[in-house]
Amino acid sequence: MLSAADFDPKPRRASVAVDVGGVIVGGGAPIVVQSMTNTDTADIDSTVAQVAALHRAGSELVRITVDRDESAAAVPKIRERLLRLGMDVPLIGDFHYIGHKLLADHPACAEALAKYRINPGNVGFKDKKDKQFAEIIEMAIRYDKPVRIGVNWGSLDQDLLTALMDENAAAGSPLSARQVTREAIVQSALLSAALAEEIGLPRNRIILSAKVSQVQDLIAVNSMLAERSNHALHLGLTEAGMGSKGIVASSAAMGFVLQHGIGDTIRVSLTPEPNGDRTREVQVAQEILQVMGFRQFVPVVAACPGCGRTTSTVFQELAQNIQNDIRKNMPVWREKYPGVEALNVAVMGCIVNGPGESKHADIGISLPGTGETPAAPVFIDGKKALTLRGPNIAADFEALVVDYIEKRFGRQTAAE
């Protein structure tokens, strides 16, 4: 018979810790949130601005494209500008095709980056593949940088895939093409990691990733990688898509894998709306980790979905205002009020679940539903503290939330 404990997250998979510019990935460290710019890296101003925005939003590592000489030359300048802004955010260089040449030709770039991302599927082809892969690994050893060996099924090593397909065709009970592709993805990562170690890069400088665009495939390849190695793992559903589809797909895929103790760093690869906010992917990554109980980034606002008892929009507007205020103030609150990210706020719309949910929160309000007495009890630390009445209930509650934060979390600052 199953017990309640059977539904808790599985223990984190034991993985080798990797230091990425002072941020620890794996080894039981908190799961790291990362993101990637979509600027032309050679455009220093726009790249610095976007890296800064992503970092302020909570991205602990930021990847930038390094695709040509101009981009490579810009990297140390970008790093310097960020440091002048007080942002010591580790930058990851995303290399494809000519990474070996760019790192060799631009030593300042090689030094400024905190990690190199290598794609085994396009690091080189035929007889040049292992040679050019080795050149990047040797640069990582020279500059003492970790690497992420990032396999992507959109650019999978075709020689390896063809060999496995041929082998499978000759088998007595052949697997499906999809299963063979999954195996090729996993083997590409593991064989590349083994080659990197053979060249001399230690395991504590290697992170692996296997990215696909289908939920079931992501679950499969990362479960296979986790079973066959103890490398730190980077999770991400590539080409997840736009809007709610991308969010749902990424959450479903990574949520399952994380629940099984797999994953040391995550990136949510959302396609932004035209002129949209790139930081949305950081927020979604944080929310995945927070709702699953793995990390705390911002106070949680619980709010009911509404029903026929809540024809007023007051509770919806209040919940939105509080959520927006929290996001806006967190950069300051995080420093001023240590521990504030653990705060739970409830904004409920009627008497059915309102009082109960509010009691479970640190501070909560149960607004009157349709036909109910126009009064809103406020609960603080599980007890009814007061009742708000009148036309300014929402504004009064917002002030109470700020007051609660100052009194509870400000004490720590004052005592230091």
Curated annotation (Swiss-Prot):
Binding site for [4Fe-4S] cluster: C304, C307, C350, E357
E.C. numbers: 1.17.7.3
Stored SUPFAM superfamilies: Nitrite and sulphite reductase 4Fe-4S domain-like (SSF56014)
Xref: Pfam families: GcpE
UniProt-listed NCBIfam families: ispG_gcpE (TIGR00612), PRK00366.1 (NF001540)
Catalytic function, reaction form: (2E)-4-hydroxy-3-methylbut-2-enyl diphosphate + oxidized [flavodoxin] + H2O + 2 H(+) = 2-C-methyl-D-erythritol 2,4-cyclic diphosphate + reduced [flavodoxin]
Cofactor binding notes: Binds 1 [4Fe-4S] cluster.
Example of a GO MF term: 4-hydroxy-3-methylbut-2-enyl-diphosphate synthase activity (flavodoxin)
Organism per entry: Rhizobium etli (strain ATCC 51251 / DSM 11541 / JCM 21823 / NBRC 15573 / CFN 42)
Alphabetized InterPro entries for the sequence: Dihydropteroate_synth-like_sf, IspG_bac, IspG_bac-typ, NO2/SO3_Rdtase_4Fe4S_sf
Protein name, entry field: 4-hydroxy-3-methylbut-2-en-1-yl diphosphate synthase (flavodoxin)
UniProtKB keywords: 4Fe-4S, Iron, Iron-sulfur, Isoprene biosynthesis, Metal-binding, Oxidoreductase
Intrachain S-S bonds: none
Pathway named in the protein's UniProt entry: Isoprenoid biosynthesis; isopentenyl diphosphate biosynthesis via DXP pathway; isopentenyl diphosphate from 1-deoxy-D-xylulose 5-phosphate: step 5/6
Family according to the record: Belongs to the IspG family.
Entry's Gene Ontology BP terms: isopentenyl diphosphate biosynthetic process, methylerythritol 4-phosphate pathway; terpenoid biosynthetic process
Chain's role: Converts 2C-methyl-D-erythritol 2,4-cyclodiphosphate (ME-2,4cPP) into 1-hydroxy-2-methyl-2-(E)-butenyl 4-diphosphate.
Cofactor: [4Fe-4S] cluster
